[in-house]
Amino acid sequence: MLKICVIGCGNMARSGHGPALLKYAAEYGDTLLAGCCDLIPEAAESFAVTFGFARAYTDYRTMLDEIRPDAVCLLCPVALTSELAVSILRLGYPLILEKPPGRNREEVAAIAGAASEAGVSVRTAFNRRYTPLVQALIGLIGNERILNITYQMYRRGRRDADFSTTSIHAIDAVRFIAKSPYRHLDLTFQELPEAGAEVANIYLNGQTESGTVVQISLVPMGGTVCERISVNTDEATYFVELPFWKNCDSPGSLIRVVGAEVTHRIAGSDLAPGGEMFEESGFYEENRGFFEHLRAGGSVINDTLDGVQAVEIADCIRRRCGRYDAE
């Protein structure tokens, strides 16, 4: 029996991870959604009822002591992520945590270090990596040389003073697709004071260590909600429309073009036929893969440092840096 606990029962838990865990428990019978925890009692109790958790708690240490789970999902605000993650890992519990894995290199390193010392697995839930259309894109590219990647992340009316914790999705996804860390990025900020203090559209231009040229548009104050990716390789051009939050591109698509010929056309509904957001957006696969790896007794996963560069670049956005150079 694989026992799972959740810490944090807010919006992200309810929209993405909760439905994914409910489906996982239904498909893998030897699974117990044992406990969920939130500082707000009503939130924990409602989450337990909605997604089939056995018990609700307001103190995570009490929950872990009583249940002794096989895996913990940490879904809390980024300001608390590193501190809580380190505490959970030091107690010896494998952990999957919502991105970002901290606000800076030091917080990420603390999580990675705690996991290494405890000898337990930790995964950061960068769900774009597990989106079926992104997985299909990487599969089609194969060994082709990637020349450039353009990623457009648009939102409507997002007046966040700090958009970096959303921006990190695009930053990590481009690095993941390129299979190479960034070498440098120039950052341009289109300040929009009429929309609110610190509100800005952000544009990143640079290159990876492998030579791929990247352009990333992070537009919280746009006209719609969508995410689109274009990739040119030495053999083909790829266009991806991601289906987040049932947006204008849902259920999404992937097209491979060579000259005037469309060689591949994949609909998002072919890869996630259930049409559920948590499947289309990668929440299900990132959780399922982690739990099944634990169940199979696989080697220890510690991918936290794999996301440290995205955290550093997000921190540059937060601090309004004009340039990022890899160390």
List where the protein language model places each region.
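C-terminal helix-rich "cap/oligomerization" subdomain common to oxidoreductases
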Residues: I7, A71-C73, V120, G289-E327
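A contiguous active-site-proximal alpha/beta segment in oxidoreductase catalytic domains
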Residues: P101-D160, G322
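Rossmann-like dinucleotide-binding domain that binds NAD(P)(H)
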Residues: Y154-V225, S230-N232, L305
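NAD(P)-dinucleotide binding in Rossmann-like oxidoreductases
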Residues: E209-E286
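Beta-loop-alpha module in the N-terminal Rossmann-like domain of NAD(P)-dependent dehydrogenases
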Residues: I40, T50-A112
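N-terminal Rossmann-like dinucleotide-binding module
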Residues: M1-F51
